[in-house]
Amino acid sequence: MNQKSVLITGCSTGIGRCLALGLHARGYRVFASVKQEKDIAALRAAGLESLALDLRAPDSIRAAMDEVLARSGGRLYALINNGAYGQPGAVEDLTREALRLQFETNLFGTQELTNRVLPVMRARNE
């Protein structure tokens, strides 16, 4: 069977988890990524292929992509950039470091992952 492989970030809870389970139920091969190792087992128990991916860490992004491509035979049909977090508080109360961490996850990490995925998808016209 030639399942279409999908990588989804931020699958521990909420929308990411629902998307992962929903696409899996529709026959997609879902690589559900989570930031914390402790969340992997629950997703695997639900029938998903799960892996650790910390969008703040370039080495984690690289390792996750290597793992997904190895397990999918170098094929990836879609990337769903769901992993992110909100930094609550008034802007004047937030430190530069708090905002930097949020941008590392929500912007820079997402951009880096997307830049790694696009050539794979384009090469296969998927």
Listing of model-derived features with the role each one plays in the protein:
Residues 114-115:
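A short, exposed helix-loop element centered on a Lys and neighboring polar residues
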Residues 82-87:
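Conserved NAD(P)H cofactor-binding loop of Rossmann-fold oxidoreductase domains
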Residues 4, 74-76, 122-126:
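Active-site loop of short-chain dehydrogenase/reductase
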Residues 90-91, 98-100:
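Substrate-binding pocket helix/loop in short-chain dehydrogenase/reductase
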